[in-house]
């Protein structure tokens, strides 16, 4: 049977994750992005090797600077390659900040993380979607790996080893089940990362982003890679998750839930949209608050609809080879 236009390739991971292990989820996102960039020919060697070489070169050059050696002995990194690495480092810091805020402020984790490859955000060649589902689903027993340990968010040695083993298991499965399209080389493209999540206080958050972006515009030449707070993220004011695509856009979904992806997403010829997560949350709220009156439930529904947003990271990555 011929594959339908924009029919996604779905790699099923089931309930392999526990969304209370925030460090694992964060590291998984970063490793998946690294894997996609290398597999899709956006860099000529694995990302970890690239970052290691970059670090060694910088250390070597710093030694020359500190000892006043001849600058001719310093190793020069090609501009595009240097920009690629610096963008990666900046992006990973931004991702780290998102998940740190989830832990520090007890926010829900992103429901969707998407990796977008194209000549621009409006001309996408390939879309990769990591679907994690709502944290409420996990709290209500849909994740078999969940437990009642109140210390799940702690980073003890045992948990560190378990997370590392789980990450290795996921990456091995991904290598084995990678789609055939990965065997076809892709030319260097621009990579953007978007996430869809619930924001607890959307008004304050948007005001902070607006003010920080204004400050950034006034200080464009003073960009610092270590500045990884909210000013490095660009909000897209759109409640529904939608990606504009082409008929030729290739879609791959990594499903980290037991849900049927087609029950969660609408895959159309020109767009990908996420079906209402807030309805699921409302259903859970109604079950847990049976004594609430209809007005309260209506207010909860409105709040859920307003608080779910998706946004695009400020940092984009231009592929090199």
Swiss-Prot record:
Residues 280-306 are annotated as: Disordered. GO terms for biological process: regulation of exit from mitosis. Residues 286-306 have a biased composition (Low complexity). GO terms for cellular component: nucleus. Disulfide bonds: none annotated. PANTHER family: MAD2L1-BINDING PROTEIN (PTHR15681:SF1). This is Putative uncharacterized protein DDB_G0286405. The lineage of its organism: Eukaryota, Amoebozoa, Evosea, Eumycetozoa, Dictyostelia.
